[in-house]
Amino acid sequence: MAFKLWLLDEETIYEHVFERYTQLEGQSGKLAQDLGIQDRRGGVLEITFEPSGLEGGRKKKRVRRRNKASSVEEDQNVAVDSYHVSVGQSISSLHSSRDNGNSTTGYVLWSTTPFFINWLLYSTSAAPFRLGSQVEVTCGSSCEGHKLELPRLVDLTGADRGKRGILELGAGISGILPVILGNFVDTYVSTDQKGILNKLKDNIMENLSQLTRKRCISRSLRLELPTVEPVGDADITAASLPSKSTLHLEVAALDWEKINLQDKKTHSLHPELSLIGETCSSVYVIAMDVIYNEYLIDPFLKTLKQLKHWLQTTYNLQFHVLVGIHLRSQEVTTLFLEKAIIEYDFTVYDIVDQVIQESRFNFYLIT
């Protein structure tokens, strides 16, 4: 069964937060009681993402070969590809008072991101983000029967002609979202503070082989489509050959404290953001575990407000935001929702799904 959306307002915020943290307390014996670092023991992490039960995945592949007519439906239903990434992280930088202006949480991989990837690609309940479909919305009797139309976040088949993009905020150093989700979108822009970017680029390049469904071009990573030797008198390039579709993948600095998209120099200051507007018809902003203290809330929401206004008014893009929160401080979660809904006037939905509710995480859809 697909997830449902609970439309939150200034009254239901508190009911939602109370219920979610009560659920969390009831599962305290099953869930890890830590801050959420994926693995603090090593400098290099090896992580595998795969469908639950590889035998099931192999069975699906055999069916697709025998019956091509059913392949689209099966591919859309759940991802069948597996991925293995190697992530270099820096525990010493995490505890440093000198690195990146003392903003160091991005130097390690936090567990919200791997959980989100597994849920998005392999959970049957996440199908609306893979299919692009209507999702049931609940918010009391006044919303009974209401549905929200969601564009695809990822296209597992490559058959959809719509152009989709992802803008990642607060990416950190891991680079695993772009090399995995980049297989299913047309443009991916990964952003963080300037001091994080070199390690982020290193990890993306290390795992570029996981982009199995795309050819990747990138100005920031200096990746170009290879040329092919001429055959006879023909001047043939890789771009002219029938092959994989192309992913535009960029890494860029984006400081939430300094961004000003009303500046007329936006195109020169943020060419990667312009790339999304110029190449896509819909964009999802993804932010995993970036709300962990109260000081980040206003800069983050101000950035979202600017991005939404600029991308919608300048490029007429469909704009959605997915925020993943590791449930630590109940006060921080409450303050984030209060400010998003009341002060910044965003429409915020809680993604209601059993798999998520059995974890330490929560995901919010913002429009």
Swiss-Prot record:
Keyword annotations from UniProtKB, A to Z: Methyltransferase, S-adenosyl-L-methionine, Transferase
Keyword Cell cycle: no
Keyword Transferase annotated: yes
GO cellular component: cytosol; protein-containing complex
Coiled-coil ranges per UniProt: none
Biased composition regions of type Basic residues, renumbered to the chain: 58-68
Listed EC numbers: 2.1.1.-
Region (Disordered): 55-74
Entry binding sites for S-adenosyl-L-methionine: W110, G170, A171, G172, D192, W256, M288
GO BP annotations listed: methylation
Function noted in UniProt: S-adenosyl-L-methionine-dependent protein-lysine N-methyltransferase that monomethylates 60S ribosomal protein L1 (RPL1A and RPL1B) at 'Lys-46'.
Similarity annotation: Belongs to the class I-like SAM-binding methyltransferase superfamily. RKM5 family.
UniProt-recorded name of the protein: Ribosomal lysine N-methyltransferase 5
